[in-house]
């Protein structure tokens, strides 16, 4: 364990602040947010942001424009630009399209589902190889 003064001092050195942009107002104010001293990175939540624009998916021109705007603000202020992505393919796509550089990939539920699906397919392959 650490003494409280030591813990507090350590937390000052190791704590980071990531601004989370998940609604249209955040997009409107992203220049100020990204320029704020003490903000270490910008995270965009495209699913929530799409809902904020009244959309049910992530393909709208409004969302595309918002992701570009947030990316420009992050780059202008030398802040990492980050988001949740379902997989490495989407990370590569968004890196190129929007300049995202930090990715939170999938979720434990998605990994378990993919792993279980893969293992089930392997079992089915064994069965079909030895059945006539």
What are these regions (language model features)?
Residues 1-132:
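Expand to "…catalyze enediolate/carbanion chemistry for C-C bond making/breaking, isomerization
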């Amino acid at each position: 364990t650490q003494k409280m003064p030591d813990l507090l001092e350590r937390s000052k050195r190791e704590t980071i602040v990531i601004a989370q942009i998940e609604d249209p107002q955040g997009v409107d104010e992203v220049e100020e947010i990204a320029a704020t001293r003490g903000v270490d990175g910008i995270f965009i939540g495209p699913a929530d942001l799409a809902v904020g624009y009244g959309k049910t998916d992530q393909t709208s021109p409004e969302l595309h424009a918002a992701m570009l705007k947030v990316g420009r603000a992050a780059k202008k202020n030398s802040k990492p630009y980050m988001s949740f992505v379902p997989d490495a393919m989407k990370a590569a796509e968004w890196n190129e399209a929007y300049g995202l550089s930090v990715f939170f990939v999938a979720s434990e539920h998605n990994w378990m589902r993919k792993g279980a699906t893969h293992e089930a397919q392997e079992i089915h392959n064994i069965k079909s190889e030895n059945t006539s």
